Amino acid sequence: MRLAIDLGGTNIRIAQVAEGKCLKRNSVACLATQDVDVILTQLFELIEPMIGETVEGIGIGVPSIVDTVHGIVYDAMNIASWKEVHLKELLEEKFGLPVAVNNDSNCFALGESLFGSGRLYENMVGITIGTGIGLGIIIHHSLYGGGYAGAGELGALPYLEADYEYYCSSGFFKRRNTTGAAESEKALKGDNDALLLWQEF
């Protein structure tokens, strides 16, 4: 069994995973505006109750470019204090388990390729839309991460008057004083304003 963690600017999610199945999960709102140590403490406290004798390792996806060999996180999107965090080293010292760190969109694409609908395809991309926007690339059933795991970091690409992330992430809804979840619920009930907002998105 392994622990799978998704560290995002909005939430930190964790799950116990074995043979492609999620056994137990938990999540907390990420204190993304706080210092590095505050967020690390959050992460440690989320991991501790999930650790058991059968846990063999930890995998964590982060919204940033990553030195995947050393597990160093650089300039995490929407987590301003995470400029250079030696996450692999910190987690391995704390829990005594092997740790793998990669870009969150890469983790998503690889998971879909191995266990999801991507299994049917030799080549695919997985697009993640949340606090930010990212993309993972699978070529011949293998992850193509590029330099610092950033091959699919399309959010910062210029688009219209800003970049893709400005228009195609949760910021789109935040600037309208709402959330994607709230507007999704309204749209499913046939709310015309919500439907128009999603059409614009």
What function would you assign to each model-found segment?
Residues 2-17:
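N-terminal beta1-alpha1 ligand-phosphate binding loop
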Residues 14, 28, 60, 173:
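Residue-level signal for inorganic ion chemistry
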Residues 15-18, 34-38, 100, 115-201:
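Glycine/GP-enriched mid-protein hinge/lid loop-to-helix segment characteristic of carbohydrate kinases
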Residues 26-28, 77, 147:
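Short hydrophobic alpha-helix segments
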